């Protein structure tokens, strides 16, 4: 019922053109003008880029974390951008690459999962969600060829397996599962090195959160495009835990405590010159 009292009609589709639970197909069919199209020229250096995202499994789920810095070439475009989002109640996605298209992709992905659940009456499986995201990355390939690369890291709780899982993607939409941890973005290599040294089977939630923050902290020491914890400005990474209870974000007070511990460890061992 609309505000003017008129009833909303149930949309009917020809069986040959019924989009079903695919929200992207519905938009393309009935609102094609709202679907982004590719332009001409290389745009990669002109837009803000998100940098480092890390994820790791622990005994009861998965942790996903992202720094807060966005860059335009050699400049810091934003110090407080958020790159980790809930996809739905039991999954989350972190973004690296061109910030604008990446955030827009996440929003469409969130709506797609909600649309599917409303149409089908049940949530998509975790692998199904990863496949859906892979398809969206594949559709972004024309923009990626112009420099607007979107590179997500997807993680969530698999109720069928009763475990956390991590999925990575390539620019063409290839989907790959990581068994323990992974990191993407400009600081991804340094973050992965820290995760490799610190991860172990049976890691608990507190240890996983600490290791995720440490991975971003160490990446920021080596990669200028990755922002480390900034207590002066009150800026800390976005860190989320996803387990059988769902997605929840770790509060900044806990992250500040971890950052202080990491600073103290650097002072004790001596800063690298």
UniProtKB/Swiss-Prot annotation:
Gene3D superfamilies: Glutamine Phosphoribosylpyrophosphate, subunit 1, domain 1. Keywords: Autocatalytic cleavage, Cytoplasm, Hydrolase, Protease, Proteasome, Threonine protease, Zymogen. Its EC number is 3.4.25.1. GO terms for biological process: modification-dependent protein catabolic process; proteasomal protein catabolic process. GO terms for molecular function: threonine-type endopeptidase activity. The formation of the proteasomal ATPase ARC-20S proteasome complex, likely via the docking of the C-termini of ARC into the intersubunit pockets in the alpha-rings, may trigger opening of the gate for substrate entry. Interconversion between the open-gate and close-gate conformations leads to a dynamic regulation of the 20S proteasome proteolysis activity. Belongs to the peptidase T1B family. Component of the proteasome core, a large protease complex with broad specificity involved in protein degradation. This is Proteasome subunit beta. It comes from Acidimicrobium ferrooxidans (strain DSM 10331 / JCM 15462 / NBRC 103882 / ICP). The gene is prcB.
């Amino acid at each position: 019922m609309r505000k003017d009292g008129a009833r909303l009609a149930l949309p009917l589709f020809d069986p040959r053109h019924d989009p079903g639970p695919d929200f992207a197909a519905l938009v393309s069919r009935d609102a094609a003008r709202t679907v982004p199209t590719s332009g001409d020229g290389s745009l990669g250096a002109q837009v803000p880029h998100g940098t480092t995202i890390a994820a790791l499994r622990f005994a009861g789920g998965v942790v996903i974390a992202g720094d807060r810095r966005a860059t335009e070439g050699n400049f810091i475009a934003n110090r407080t951008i958020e790159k980790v989002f809930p996809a739905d109640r039991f999954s989350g996605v972190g973004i690296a690459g061109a910030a604008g298209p990446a955030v827009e992709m996440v929003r469409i992905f969130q709506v797609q999962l909600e649309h599917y659940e409303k149409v089908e009456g049940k949530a998509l499986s975790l692998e199904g969600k990863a496949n859906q995201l892979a398809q969206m990355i594949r559709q972004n390939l024309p923009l990626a060829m112009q420099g607007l690369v979107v590179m997500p890291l997807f993680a969530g709780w698999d109720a069928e397996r009763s475990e956390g899982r991590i999925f990575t993607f390539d620019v063409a939409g290839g989907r790959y599962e990581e068994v323990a941890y992974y990191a993407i973005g400009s600081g991804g290599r340094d973050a992965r090195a820290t995760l490799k040294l610190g991860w172990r089977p049976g890691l608990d939630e507190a240890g996983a959160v600490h290791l995720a923050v440490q991975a971003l902290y160490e990446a920021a020491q080596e990669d200028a495009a990755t922002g480390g914890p900034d207590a002066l400005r009150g800026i800390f990474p976005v860190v989320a835990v996803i387990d059988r209870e769902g997605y929840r974000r770790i509060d900044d007070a806990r992250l500040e405590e971890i950052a202080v511990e990491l600073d103290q460890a650097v002072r004790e061992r001596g800063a690298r010159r």
